[in-house]
Curated annotation (Swiss-Prot):
The keyword Hydrolase applies. One of its GO terms (cellular component) is nucleus. Residues 20-29 have a biased composition (Polar residues). It holds the Pfam family RNase_3_N. GO terms for molecular function: double-stranded RNA binding; ribonuclease III activity. Residues 1-29, 168-189, 451-471 are annotated as: Disordered. The keyword Transcription does not apply. It catalyses: Endonucleolytic cleavage to 5'-phosphomonoester. This is Ribonuclease 3. Residues 369-437 form the DRBM domain. One of its GO terms (biological process) is U1 snRNA 3'-end processing.
Length: 471
């Protein structure tokens, strides 16, 4: 207990360590190497990081392995302070305690000091991603200064970064940040929409660890048996996908609910299905190149794989995970951005669906009295004006087709609608537009005796009403 209290006092005494060395740490950019045009921290490599996390979990029997693989604390801080230049596969590991503990043990080894192993069992509880000071007590401010001098010698031997290239990269990043959230990336959209500015600019996830987790599939984590259950669950994108799926459905529901106040529940469900189907979400995912960033332990391009046979659902999943990542990153500020972004993506899908799908057609301009009007103009008993259902709606084709006919089989008008009632009304409306036909049958009705022209309107089966010849 006394050791722990002393440790906390030591930490308080070293609170100024980061402030005093902040400028020096920011100068550590010269320890990076220029790899394929991108700046990357050279002290950590992905495979070694995986081994390091395992070694820390099994520290007692793996201490020697940690000393062999781990960079020291200065190198670790360089990676933490420059996460935007760290390979994305490594970012989740920087949010866990194991790498920092390994770096501190390596620091003690470099400084020829004995490790305080009694502190190791409590290390995970003390670990905080926001805390930059060493947790192990034996690493003092003087030790860090000495280590800085050793690192300076190493830095002088490394290849220096082309300053002009680095500045150009910074300028490019600044230009991108200056673009407003309403701006667009003028990339091609394929068959989704033909527009000059498409797709809408992607809202950015600021937290690099969350952004990296969006593109990590569960298959890359399942063999990491050294991770605890909680660490494993939070190392891949399934939880983010779960959150993003709910957000996507809710936002799309609100968009169409407010946009179409006259739509029935069935119509709203049909339209929402167009917006949140795996096929549509997959198209959006590919449009933003999410499929190229997805990390799995199987070949996504294998044409015979179960993945391909599953219609590329993983691509839709990563899009939902990105939405979830935005919410986890900054729910208060990002939710309005998500709504605005999804509204832009939804617009061409909604326009196409409402234009081409009969089930989504509006009926506010439908003349509900069209059948009565048609009978009043040309109807009489022997004409036998009636409506025949030519096609009923099915799951494959929701269209209904109804024909307005007379007794001899002549078709006066044809109507199409999402149900038989609407299709019948449209058939009557179609017949009413044919003025030549109406004139022909009106003259026929006028030529017959009045007693034969009295008829019962078949469309009013429950009403005892007669239409007399008024011509």
């Amino acid at each position: 207990m006394g050791s722990k209290v002393a440790g906390k006092k030591k930490t308080q005494n070293d609170n100024k360590l980061d402030n005093e060395n902040g400028s020096q740490q920011r100068e550590n950019i010269n320890t990076k190497t220029l790899l394929k045009g991108n700046l990357k921290i050279s002290n950590y490599k992905y495979l070694e990081v995986i081994q390091l996390e395992h070694a820390v979990t099994k520290l007692v029997e793996s201490y020697n392995k940690i000393i062999e693989l781990s960079p020291n604390l200065v190198a670790y801080n360089e990676a933490v302070n420059n996460q935007d230049r760290v390979p994305v596969q490594i970012l989740p590991s920087l949010s866990r305690y194991q790498l920092k503990l390994a770096a501190e043990l390596k620091t003690l080894h470099d400084l020829k000091k004995d490790a305080i192993l009694t502190e190791i069992t409590d290390y995970e509880n003390e670990f905080d991603t926001e805390q930059k000071q060493p947790i192990l007590q034996e690493i003092s401010k003087a030790d860090m200064e000495k280590l800085e001098k050793l690192e300076q010698v190493k830095r002088e031997k490394r290849e220096k970064i082309d300053v002009n290239v680095y500045e150009n990269l910074n300028e490019k990043e600044d230009e991108e940040e200056d673009e407003g959230e309403d701006s667009y990336d003028p990339t091609k959209a394929g068959d989704i929409v033909k527009a000059t500015k498409w797709p809408p600019k992607l809202p950015e996830i600021q937290d690099l660890a969350i952004r990296a987790r969006v593109f990590i599939h569960k298959s890359t984590i399942k063999d990491k048996v050294y991770l605890s259950g909680s660490e494993m669950i939070n190392a891949h994108n399934e939880r983010l996908e779960f959150l993003g799926d709910s957000i996507l459905n809710s936002v799309m529901t609100l968009i169409i609910y407010n946009k179409f106040p006259d739509y029935s529940e069935g119509q709203l469900s049909t339209l929402r299905m167009n917006l949140v189907s795996n096929e549509q979400i997959k198209q959006w995912s590919i449009m933003y190149n999410f499929h190229e960033k997805l990390k799995t332990n199987f070949d996504l391009k294998d044409e015979n794989s179960n993945f391909q046979n599953g219609k590329l659902k993983l691509y839709a999943d990563v899009f939902e995970a990105y939405i979830g990542g935005l919410m986890e990153d900054d729910p208060r500020n990002n939710l309005p951005k998500i709504r605005k972004w999804l509204r832009k993506l939804a617009k061409p899908v909604i326009e196409e669906a409402t234009r081409n799908q009969v089930a989504l057609e509006k009926t506010d301009k439908l003349d509900m009295n069209a059948k009565r009007q048609l009978y009043s103009l040309i109807g009489y008993a022997s004409l036998r004006l009636h409506y025949v259902t030519v096609k009923k709606p099915t799951a494959v084709d929701p269209n209904s087709i109804v024909e307005c006919r007379v007794g001899d089989g002549t078709v006066l008008g044809t109507g199409v609608g999402r149900n038989i009632k609407i299709a019948g009304i449209r058939a009557a409306e179609n017949a009413l537009r044919d003025k030549k036909m109406l004139d022909f049958y009106a003259k026929q009705r006028a030529a017959i005796p009045r007693s034969e022209s009295v008829l019962k309107d078949p469309s009013q089966k429950n009403k005892k009403r007669k239409f007399s010849d008024t011509s």
